[in-house]
Curated annotation (Swiss-Prot):
SUPFAM superfamilies: beta and beta-prime subunits of DNA dependent RNA-polymerase. InterPro entries: DNA-dir_RpoC2_beta_pp (IPR012756), RNA_pol_beta''_euk (IPR050254), RNA_pol_Rpb1_3_sf (IPR042102), RNA_pol_Rpb1_4 (IPR007083), RNA_pol_Rpb1_5 (IPR007081), Rpb1_funnel_sf (IPR038120). Belongs to the RNA polymerase beta' chain family. RpoC2 subfamily. It comes from Cycas taitungensis (Prince sago). This is DNA-directed RNA polymerase subunit beta''. Keywords: Chloroplast, DNA-directed RNA polymerase, Metal-binding, Nucleotidyltransferase, Plastid, Transcription, Transferase, Zinc. In plastids the minimal PEP RNA polymerase catalytic core is composed of four subunits: alpha, beta, beta', and beta''. When a (nuclear-encoded) sigma factor is associated with the core the holoenzyme is formed, which can initiate transcription.
Length: 1339
C-alpha cells in the first residue's frame, strides 16, 4: 500500500500489513483527511477502490452451496440442548417447575447453544478453509454479517411471534441443511425483514427527513460569535464507569470551549478554542474536570447560528464557513440513516431474556464451607434449589493443598450446599449485578391438558377483588391438580337415571331432558314411594353398590336439591357460582293469612367450611324493600359500634360495613323521589323547576310516575332529572327559611308560624335565578325497627346446630348511610334493612372451623333432610345406613311420588360414551347437574410385589390377632375424619387384622390418639364412600341416636405406613419396587395387593398466581387454569429503531407521568429556596429543567442510532432539539396588550419584549414535535408548503401576516435567491445588515 502514499516519507507513516475491515477503513480515511486534506484523500481513496476491484476480478470469487460448511460440533451441541430440554420437561411434568421456569431454562439453553455455534463458526472456517468465499465475504466489511452467515451454517434458535411471545420450538436447522415445514412456518414470523419491511422503512425514513428539514430549513450560519456564555458540560467519568473513548472523542472533537480548562492551576485550553484530536486525547488522558463546551442549542443568534457555537464542519474538519445551511444538513443527517434502522429489535437470531448475573466458579477441587444460619432456601429462576444470603457471606474452599476464601455479595444465589465437594470450574454462586435494569410484570396463562375435576390444597384463598367470581389466589407455592374423568351434561335440566357410583356400559342412557317438578318436603308428608320400575320397560337390574353400607357425604354438595326440615319453611337449593344459596319459602298452609313472610337465605360456602363470625344466613324482610328512588335519613335508630373482632363478614356489601351500620332499634326515614338518567338534552320535554302531574310526558318515551317539582342537573355527559313529590310553599320571609332548609320536621311541629305538620316532612330551600324562592314540602315514609331481632318464623335452631357451644347471633343492619341517595335501576327493588345470622362459639384450639352438611337420612321408609353444623378441627364425615332395596335408584327418585311418568323416548336421552363408574357432580354454569364417568382409561391399578417388604408386612399383620374395643363418639350421626379432604394432615393407613385408619395428627375430640377401625374387607374411594363386606356390617346403631358405636382395634405399636386414601401422589414417587407409577394421580382404593389410582395432571403455581375456577369444578380440555405473574427484565422500550426516533422527534409521551409530580415539584422548590434564599427558585428550576430535557432528548436519540451501529454527530441532533424547544406558551394576562394567553411565540421574542416594556411576562416552556413546529413558524409560505395549504393561507390572509422570506424554502417557492452559500452575501447586502458581519473578514 506504500505506493498509494506519495507523501508517506514526509509524514513518516508506518507500514501496516493487516486486513482492513469497514471500521479500519473509516479510521484510515479520517487520518488521511487530518494529515493531507480532502484533495489527497480523494486521490488515495480512488486508488484504493480501483485496486480493490482489480483484486476482486482476478480472484473471481463465487458462492456455491458447497462453500457453506456447518461446524462439526453442532450435532452434539443440539443433542445436549435437547437433553436439557427433556430433563426440564420431565421436571415440569412431575410438578417440580412451573411453565415460566421451564420457558426460561429453554430460552437460555437454546441461546447458549446458538452462541456456541456462532463462536465455533469462525475458527472452523480458519482451520478447514481460510479462503472460503463465505468466510471472506462475511468478514470483508462490504456486505453481509456474521449474523447472516450464522443463519446459513449455524442455527436460528428461538424466535418471537408477532405478539412478542417466544415460540417454544427452536429452529435447529440452518439454510444449508434445509428447514422443515414447521421451522419454515415459524421463520415466516420474521418476514418483516423482507421486501415489505424495507419498503415501509424507506418511506418512513423519507417522511421523517422531510419533517425534520421543514423544522430547521432556515438555520444558516450568519455570525462568527454570538457572545453567549452558556453551554453544556461533558463529564469524562460518568457514574462508576468511564465513558468509552470513542463516544467521548465524538462528543469533544470539533467543538469549541465555552470556558478555560485548568489542570492544577495551569491553563491548558482557553475559551473559544476549538478542540482537535490532540487536545481531546490530552483532556481524556489528564482527566480534567467536566469540560464546558458551546453547543447549537444555547446559541443566542435569532433564527440562525454562529460559527463558534456550531464548531468544526464534519466535512473538512475546519471551522464552519459563513452561509453554510447547517439546518438542512442536520435534518438529512438524522433522517437518511433511518433506512438502516430496524423497525423492531428482534429480527434475525434467537432472543435471550435472562437476568444479568456473574458466575463464581471454584478455582480448584475441594469442599465448600459456609455458615448455614446466614442463608435461607429459595428457588432460582429455573426452579432449581438454591440458597440466598441477605448480607455478605464468607465462603471457604478447602482443597488438598490450599485454602481459598471468597466473599459473596448480598442478594446472591449460592448453588451448592454446605460441606459439599465441588470440582474445578464448577459454578458455586451467582452474583447479580448491582444496577439491575428495569423490570416489567408479565402474565402467562396455563391451560388444562386434561378433562376432569379441579383440586388444590389449602394454600388457595378467594381473591378479595373478585368476591362474586371464581378467581382465587395462591398464598404460597403449591400444586394444582386436574383429576381425570369424562364429562356428560346438557344445557337443559337433566334427570339422572343412575345414582352415584353406579356402573354403566357404553351407549347406556344416563339422563333425560325433563323439567323437575316442585317437590318440597314438609312434616305433613314424609313418606315417598320408590320408583321400582326401570327405564327400559322391562325388569333389568342395574349394578350398583346399594347392597353395602354407604356413607352419605355432602361435603361437595353432590345433591342438587336439598331440604331442611322445619315447622313453617320449605327450603330448596339453587346452585349459583361459588356459593350455595337456599332460598326460604313460607308455607301458607301453616302461616298467618295475609301477612307477607320474610325471605331467609342460607349462605354456606361451597366446601361447607365456616369460620367464626361468618354469616350463616340472611333474612330479607319485604317490609323494608322499596321500589322507588330516594334519600335515607337516620331518625331515632340506635347505632351500635362493632369492633374488628366481631366484624360481620359474608358478602360484598357486608365487607364494607361501617361501625354505625348495626342498629339496636328505632325509626329511620325514607324520602321518595323519581330519578331518570338521560343522555340527550334535546329529548327533554319539561323545564327545570317546573311542576308536573303524574303521567306527564317528560321525554319522548318516558312518562312520570309521580307528580311534583322537576329538577334537572347536568353531570358530565349525562343529565339527571329528579321529580320531587309534595307541595310547594312560597314563604313571605326568606330569612326564616334557612332554619328549615334540608331538615326533617316531626309530626305536630308548627312550620313557618302558619300550619302544623301531621306527618314527617322534609323541607328543601330552592332559589331559582331571577325568581322568587320557594320551599318544596316533601312527604317522608317512616320505618320502624324493634330493639331485638324480629324473626317472625319459628326457625328451629336446635335442629341446625350440634352441641351447646354453637350459637347463632342475630343483628339488623341498615345497608345505606345517613343522607345516602338511593337510585332504583330497571325497576329492581332495593332492600334497606337486612338481618344477619352469624355463627359463634367459644374459641378453642381444637375447634377452629364449623362444617355444614346437607344430609338425607332415611329410616323405616321415612326420609328426613337436615342441615347439620359441627365444630371440629377438620371436616367431619357422616355415616348413614341406606335401606337395601333392589329397586332403589338415586335419592332423586325417592322424592318423586307426584312426578310425571318417565318416558322412554330415545331421542331425549343422554347416552354414555364410556364404560365406567358414575360420579354425580353439580354443574357450575347451568341450573342442572353433570355426570362424570370414570372409565378404565382414567384409572390405573398398581400391583404390590409379593416379595416386597410392603406385602410381607401386610400378610403378617393380617395373621395377627388384636383386641377389639368399643368406644362411644359423641355427635349427631357420628363423627369420623374425612379422608378425601383438603386438610394438610396426612392420614396414614396401617395394616392389622382390621385395617386401621390412624388419625395421628389431630383427633376429633380431646388430645388422645384415636384409631377408627374399618373391618378387614372394605373399599373406600375418593368420594369418602366406605363399603364393608365383613360380618360386622350392621354394628352401627340407630341413626337418630346421638351416641354412635364403632368397633375400634388396638393400636399397633409399630405400624408400617404405606399410603393414604385420597392421597395425591406424583409420578416420581416410588410405591412398588417392581412397577413404576403410570402417572400422577389420586389413590381412590386400597386392596391387600394393589392400589387403584385415578390419573391426574398436576401444575405448579407460584405465590400470587391466579386460579380460575372453584375447588371440585368441572374443567374441560383447553380451559384456563392458572395465570402466573412473573417479572422479566426490559431491554429498553418495546418501540425501537425508526419508530422510536419518530416518537422522540414528535415529542410523544413515552412513560406515564408520576403520580407524585406535584410533591416532587414542591420538594425541589423548597430545596431551591433554601439554596438561593428566594421563593422564586422554581423559575430557576424551570430553566434548568429545560436545559436538562434538551440533553436527555439528544442522548435518547443518539442511543437509538448507536444501538444500530449508526454514528451521527451530536450537533445535528442539537439543532433539531433547539427548534423543538424554542417556543413558549403565554400563560398569563400581564401583557394582554402584546400577547394573548395561549399564544405560541419565540422565547427570544418574549425576552426582548420583556426587556423593552420592563414588565414580567408569564409563559411556560413547550416541547413541540417536528410536525407542530413546522406549522408554527414565522413564515406562512413555509407552513403552507408543508401541509394544510388552504387553511394556512386563509388564516394568514385574515390575520394580515407578513412573511420576511428569511428561510430557504420560502425563497425557493417564490423563485428568489436562496440565502445560503453563494447567495448568503447578497442576502446580507439587501437586508441592510452591513454593520453586523463584514463579508470580507467574517466579523
Amino acid at each position: 500500500m506504500r505506493r498509494f502514499f506519495p507523501m508517506a516519507e514526509r509524514a513518516k507513516l508506518l507500514f501496516h500489513n493487516e486486513a482492513m475491515d469497514k471500521t479500519a477503513m473509516k479510521q484510515l480515511i479520517s487520518r488521511l483527511i487530518n494529515h493531507f486534506g480532502m484533495t489527497y484523500t480523494s486521490n488515495i481513496s480512488d486508488q484504493l477502490k480501483t485496486s480493490g476491484f482489480q483484486r476482486a476480478t482476478d480472484a473471481a470469487i463465487s458462492l456455491g452451496i458447497d462453500d457453506l460448511l456447518t461446524a462439526p460440533s453442532k450435532g452434539w451441541l443440539v443433542q445436549d440442548a435437547e437433553q436439557q430440554g427433556s430433563i426440564s420437561e420431565k421436571h415440569h411434568h412431575y410438578g417440580n417447575v412451573h411453565a415460566v421456569e421451564k420457558l426460561r431454562q429453554s430460552i437460555e439453553t437454546w441461546y447458549a447453544t446458538s452462541e456456541y455455534l456462532r463462536q465455533e463458526m469462525n475458527p472452523n472456517f480458519r482451520m478447514t478453509d481460510p479462503f472460503n468465499p463465505v468466510h471472506m465475504m462475511s468478514f470483508s466489511g462490504s456486505r453481509g454479517s456474521t449474523s447472516q452467515v450464522h443463519q446459513l451454517v449455524g442455527m436460528r434458535g428461538l424466535v418471537s411471534d408477532p405478539q412478542g411471545q417466544i415460540v417454544d420450538l427452536p429452529i435447529q436447522s440452518n439454510f444449508r441443511e434445509g428447514l422443515s415445514l414447521t421451522e419454515y412456518i415459524i421463520s415466516c414470523y420474521g418476514a418483516r425483514k423482507g421486501v415489505v419491511d424495507t419498503a415501509v422503512r424507506t418511506s418512513d425514513a423519507g417522511y421523517l427527513t422531510r419533517r425534520l428539514v421543514e423544522v430547521v430549513q432556515h438555520i444558516v450560519v450568519r455570525k462568527t460569535d454570538c457572545g453567549t456564555i452558556q453551554g453544556i458540560f461533558v463529564n469524562l467519568i460518568q457514574g462508576r464507569e468511564r465513558i468509552k473513548n470513542r463516544i467521548v472523542l465524538q462528543t469533544l472533537i470539533g467543538r469549541v470551549l465555552a470556558d478555560d480548562v485548568y489542570i492544577d492551576m495551569r491553563c491548558i485550553a482557553t475559551r473559544n478554542q476549538d478542540i482537535g484530536v490532540g487536545l481531546a486525547h490530552q483532556l481524556i488522558t489528564l482527566r480534567a474536570q467536566p469540560i464546558y463546551i458551546r453547543t447549537p442549542s444555547t446559541c443566542k443568534s435569532l433564527s440562525r447560528i454562529c460559527r463558534l457555537c456550531y464548531g468544526r464542519s464534519p466535512t473538512h474538519g475546519n471551522l464552519i464557513e459563513l452561509g453554510e445551511a447547517v439546518g438542512i444538513i442536520a435534518g438529512q443527517s438524522i433522517g437518511e440513516p433511518g433506512t438502516q434502522l430496524t423497525l423492531r429489535t428482534f429480527h434475525t437470531g434467537g432472543i435471550f431474556t435472562g437476568d444479568i448475573a456473574e458466575h463464581v466458579r471454584a478455582p480448584f477441587n475441594g469442599k465448600i464451607e459456609f455458615d448455614e444460619n446466614l442463608v435461607y432456601p429459595t428457588r432460582t429462576r429455573h426452579g432449581h434449589p438454591a440458597f440466598m444470603c441477605h448480607n455478605n457471606l464468607s465462603i471457604t474452599l478447602d482443597g488438598q493443598d490450599q485454602v481459598h476464601d471468597l466473599t459473596i455479595s448480598p442478594q446472591s444465589l449460592l448453588l451448592v450446599q454446605n460441606n459439599q465437594y465441588v470440582e474445578s470450574e464448577q459454578i458455586i454462586a451467582e452474583v447479580h449485578a448491582r444496577t439491575s435494569p428495569s423490570k416489567e410484570k408479565v402474565r402467562k396463562h396455563i391451560y388444562s391438558n386434561l378433562e376432569g375435576e379441579m383440586h388444590w390444597s389449602t394454600n388457595v384463598c378467594h381473591a378479595p377483588e373478585y368476591v362474586q367470581g371464581n378467581v382465587h389466589l395462591i398464598l404460597r407455592t403449591s400444586h394444582l391438580w386436574v383429576l381425570s374423568g369424562g364429562i356428560h351434561g346438557s344445557s337443559a335440566v337433566s334427570f339422572p337415571f343412575h345414582k352415584d357410583q353406579d356402573q354403566v356400559n357404553v351407549q347406556l342412557p344416563l339422563a333425560k331432558h325433563e323439567l323437575l317438578p316442585d317437590y318440597s318436603v314438609n312434616q305433613d308428608r314424609m313418606k315417598h314411594k320408590s320408583v321400582d320400575s326401570n327405564f327400559y320397560g322391562k325388569e333389568e337390574q342395574i349394578s350398583s353398590y346399594s347392597e353395602i353400607d354407604r356413607v352419605i357425604s355432602n361435603e361437595h354438595w353432590d345433591s342438587i336439591y336439598s331440604t331442611i326440615s322445619s315447622d313453617n319453611f320449605n327450603i330448596s337449593g339453587k346452585k349459583q357460582r361459588n356459593r350455595f344459596f337456599v332460598p326460604l319459602r313460607y308455607d301458607k298452609e301453616r302461616g298467618n293469612k295475609g301477612i307477607s313472610r320474610p325471605n331467609l337465605i342460607i349462605k354456606i360456602s361451597r366446601n361447607g367450611i365456616s369460620q367464626r363470625n361468618d354469616i350463616f344466613a340472611v333474612l330479607d324482610d319485604p317490609r323494608y324493600r322499596i321500589n322507588s328512588s330516594g334519600i335515607i335519613k337516620y331518625g331515632t335508630i340506635k347505632v351500635d359500634s362493632i369492633g374488628n373482632k366481631e366484624n360481620y363478614l359474608g358478602d360484598q356489601r357486608a365487607r364494607g360495613f361501617r361501625s354505625k351500620d348495626k342498629m339496636k332499634g328505632g325509626r329511620f326515614l325514607f324520602i321518595p323521589e323519581e330519578v331518570h338518567i338521560l343522555y340527550e338534552s334535546s329529548s327533554i320535554m319539561v323545564q327545570n323547576n317546573s311542576i308536573i302531574r303524574a303521567g306527564t310526558q317528560i321525554t319522548c318515551d318516558i312518562e312520570s310516575q309521580v307528580g311534583g317539582l322537576v329538577r334537572i342537573v347536568r353531570i358530565k355527559k349525562k343529565i339527571e332529572m329528579r321529580i320531587l313529590p309534595g307541595d310547594i310553599y312560597f314563604p313571605g320571609e326568606i330569612h326564616g327559611i334557612s332554619r328549615h332548609n334540608g331538615t326533617l320536621i316531626p309530626p305536630g311541629k308548627i312550620l313557618f308560624d302558619e300550619f302544623q305538620s301531621e306527618n314527617w316532612i322534609y323541607l328543601q330551600w330552592i332559589i331559582p335565578p331571577k325568581e322568587k324562592p320557594f320551599v318544596p314540602v316533601r312527604p317522608v315514609v317512616e320505618y320502624g325497627i324493634p330493639d331485638g331481632p324480629d324473626i317472625t318464623a319459628p326457625l328451629s335452631l336446635d335442629l341446625l346446630r350440634e352441641g351447646d357451644n354453637l350459637q347463632v347471633r342475630v343483628g339488623n343492619f341498615l345497608l345505606y348511610g345517613d343522607g345516602e341517595r338511593i337510585q332504583v335501576i330497571n325497576d329492581i327493588s332495593i332492600q334497606l334493612v337486612r338481618t344477619y345470622l352469624v355463627l359463634d362459639w367459644e374459641q378453642k384450639d381444637s375447634m377452629e372451623e364449623a362444617y355444614a352438611y346437607l344430609t338425607e337420612v332415611r329410616t323405616n321408609g321415612i326420609v328426613r333432610n337436615x342441615l347439620q353444623i359441627s365444630l371440629a378441627k377438620y371436616p367431619i364425615l357422616y355415616m348413614g345406613k341406606r335401606k337395601n332395596t333392589a329397586g332403589s335408584k338415586s335419592m332423586f327418585h325417592n322424592k318423586l311420588d307426584h312426578a310425571n311418568p318417565i318416558s322412554s323416548n330415545e331421542e331425549s336421552q343422554l347416552l354414555s360414551q364410556h364404560q365406567g363408574t358414575i360420579r354425580a357432580l353439580p354443574n357450575e354454569r347451568e341450573e342442572g347437574g353433570s355426570l362424570m364417568v370414570l372409565s378404565p382409561s382414567d384409572c390405573s391399578r398398581i400391583v404390590l410385589s409379593k416379595g416386597s417388604k410392603h406385602y410381607d408386612m401386610v400378610n403378617r399383620s393380617i395373621q395377627d390377632d388384636s383386641m377389639m374395643q368399643i368406644i362411644e363418639l359423641s355427635g349427631f350421626l357420628g363423627n369420623l375424619h374425612s379422608i378425601a379432604n383438603r386438610s394438610p394432615s396426612s392420614h396414614s393407613i396401617t395394616y392389622n387384622k382390621y385395617y386401621n385408619i390412624s388419625l395421628k395428627e389431630q383427633p376429633i375430640f380431646g388430645n388422645s390418639e384415636n384409631t377408627l377401625r374399618v373391618p378387614k374387607w372394605y373399599f373406600m374411594d375418593e368420594n369418602t364412600v366406605v363399603s364393608n363386606f365383613g360380618p360386622c356390617r350392621n354394628i352401627i346403631s340407630d341413626l337418630f341416636n346421638s351416641n354412635r358405636c364403632f368397633p375400634l382395634s388396638k393400636f399397633c405399636e409399630n405400624p408400617f405406613p404405606v399410603v393414604s386414601l385420597g392421597q395425591l401422589i406424583r409420578e416420581s414417587v416410588r410405591i412398588s419396587e417392581d412397577e413404576p407409577l403410570p402417572g400422577s394421580g389420586q389413590i381412590i382404593a386400597v386392596h391387600e395387593e394393589s392400589l387403584v389410582i385415578r390419573l391426574a395432571e398436576l401444575y405448579l403455581a407460584t405465590r400470587r398466581a391466579t386460579v380460575h375456577g372453584h375447588y371440585g369444578e368441572i374443567i374441560n380440555e383447553g380451559d384456563t387454569l392458572i395465570t402466573l405473574i412473573y417479572e422479566r427484565f426490559k431491554s429498553g422500550d418495546i418501540i425501537q429503531g425508526l419508530p422510536k426516533v419518530e416518537q422522540l422527534s414528535e415529542a410523544r409521551s413515552i412513560n406515564s407521568i408520576s403520580m407524585n409530580l406535584e410533591k416532587s415539584f414542591e420538594d425541589w422548590n423548597r430545596d431551591m429556596t433554601r439554596s438561593l434564599g428566594s421563593p422564586w427558585g422554581s423559575f430557576i428550576s424551570s430553566k434548568i429543567t429545560m436545559e436538562q430535557s434538551r440533553i436527555h432528548l439528544v442522548n435518547q436519540i443518539q442511543r437509538v442510532y448507536r444501538s444500530q451501529g449508526v454514528q451521527i454527530s451530536d450537533k445535528h441532533i442539537e439543532i433539531i432539539v433547539r427548534q423543538m424547544t424554542s417556543k413558549v406558551l403565554i400563560s398569563g394576562d400581564g401583557m394582554a396588550d402584546v400577547f394573548l394567553p395561549g399564544e405560541l411565540i419565540e422565547l427570544s421574542r418574549a425576552q426582548r419584549m420583556d426587556r423593552a416594556l420592563k414588565e414580567a411576562t408569564y409563559y411556560r416552556t413547550m416541547l413541540l414535535g417536528a410536525t407542530r413546529a413546522s406549522l408554527d413558524t414565522q413564515s406562512f409560505i413555509s407552513e403552507a408548503g408543508f401541509q394544510e395549504t388552504a387553511r394556512v393561507l386563509a388564516r394568514a390572509a385574515l390575520q394580515g401576516r407578513i412573511d420576511w422570506l428569511k428561510g430557504l424554502k420560502e425563497n425557493v417557492i417564490l423563485g428568489g435567491i436562496v440565502p445560503a452559500g453563494t447567495g448568503f452575501k447578497q442576502s446580507i447586502y439587501h437586508s441592510g445588515e452591513r454593520n453586523e458581519i463584514d463579508p470580507r473578514t467574517g466579523k
